[in-house]
Amino acid sequence: MWLLYLILGSVESQLLPGNNHTTECNIPGNFMCSNGRCIPGGWQCDGNPDCFDESDEKECPRARSRCGPNFFPCTSGIHCIIARFQCNGFEDCPDGSDEENCTAHPLLCSNSRFHCKNHLCIDKSFVCDGQNNCLDNSDEEHCHSPQEPGSEQDYVSSENQLLYYPSITYTIIGSSVIFVLVVALLALVLHHQRKRNLMSLPVHRLQHPLLLSRLVVLDHPHHCRVTYNVNNGIQYMSGQGYQQPVSVESPPSYTEAVLDHSSRPPWFDLPPPPYPSDMESVSQTELPPYRSRTGSSASAGSTEHPRGTPCGTESPTEPQDPTAAPSDDLPSTEVDV
C-alpha cells in the first residue's frame, strides 16, 4: 500500500508543473513570484524585474541613496538619473520609480514645468519638440499658435531656443578676425615686394652709360643718305624717292658740349690750322675744307659715297626756312650710312 502511494505521488509531481515550482520554492533562499515561478532569492529587489509580473521588485525597501543632490535615486538604489528627468513622462529608472506618484508631489509639477492633460509633468524643453512626451500629445498641441491668455500651459520661450546662439556668434567673429589678419598680411607682403622692385630699378639704370640716351636708331633702306646740318639738326633722306625728312633730336648745346670733358677727342684743345694768305684766298674759288671733330674733312657740299656702299644716291640738302632766325652760316655735313 505504501509503495502504491509513493508511485502515485512521484507521477503527480512530474505531471503537475505547479507542484514542481512549489518544490523548488521550498528550497531555502528562493523567491516565488505571483504566478508561481521561483527565482533565486538574490534576484529579488535588484532593480531588474525577473518575474513576468514584476512581483520581485514590488514592496522592496528603498535602499540607501548614493546619488548626488542634483540626481534622483531609483528605488533599487543602484541607478541614479538627473533630477529634472523625474516625472517627465518617460521611465528613466529601470524599475520606473521616477514616474511613480508624480501628481502627489506638487513641487514636481510646479509652474516651472509643463502640465500635461493626463496630469503628467514634463520639462519645458520637451514641449513642441516633435515627440509625444506627455503620451497624450498635449505637449505638441498649439505649437505654432500664440498662447491663449489664462492658459495653464507654458511653452518654450525664445530664450531657451537660442541657448547655443552665443557660441555660433563667437565662431563667426573669430573667423572674421582671422580672415582680416590673413588679408592684411598678404597686402603687407605684396607692398614690401613692390617696394623692393622699385628700389632695385636705379641700380640697373646706372650700369648703362649716360650717352645711350643720345643714340638714334635708324632703319636704313637699301639706298639712303644722312645729312648732318648744324642749323637743322640731323636729317634722314631715302634714295628711293624723296621722302619727308625725319627730324631727330638736335645735338647738345655749346655749353653742354664744352662742359662734357669725357666726350672731347684728343685733338680738341689743339690750335686751329693756319689761315691762307689774302692772295691765295682770292685765287681759290672753292671754300677751304671743313674738318669735323672726328678728324675727317669734307667740302661745303655733300660728299659722294664711294662705290660699293649701300647708299649711293645723293639727296639735296633741305632748304632752310627763310623766316628762321639768322645763324652763323655754318656748313652742313652729309655722311653716308
Swiss-Prot record:
Disulfide bonds join C25-C38, C33-C51, C45-C60, C67-C80, C74-C93, C87-C102, C109-C121, C116-C134, C128-C143. Residues 243-337 are annotated as: Disordered. Its main location: membrane. It holds the Pfam family Ldl_recept_a. Keywords: Cell membrane, Disulfide bond, Glycoprotein, Lipoprotein, Membrane, Receptor, Repeat, Signal, Transmembrane, Transmembrane helix. SUPFAM superfamilies: LDL receptor-like module. Residues 291-303 have a biased composition (Low complexity). Residues 24-61, 66-103, 108-144 form the LDL-receptor class A domain. It comes from the Eukaryota. Residues 243-253 have a biased composition (Polar residues). GO terms for cellular component: plasma membrane. It is found in: Cell membrane. The chain crosses the membrane at residues 170-190. It is a single-pass type I membrane protein. Glycans are attached at N20, N101. Residues 191-337 are cytoplasmic. Residues 1-13 form the signal peptide. Residues 14-169 are extracellular. Belongs to the LDLR family. PANTHER family: LOW-DENSITY LIPOPROTEIN RECEPTOR CLASS A DOMAIN-CONTAINING PROTEIN 3, LOW-DENSITY LIPOPROTEIN RECEPTOR-RELATED. This is Low-density lipoprotein receptor class A domain-containing protein 3. It comes from Xenopus tropicalis. The gene is ldlrad3.
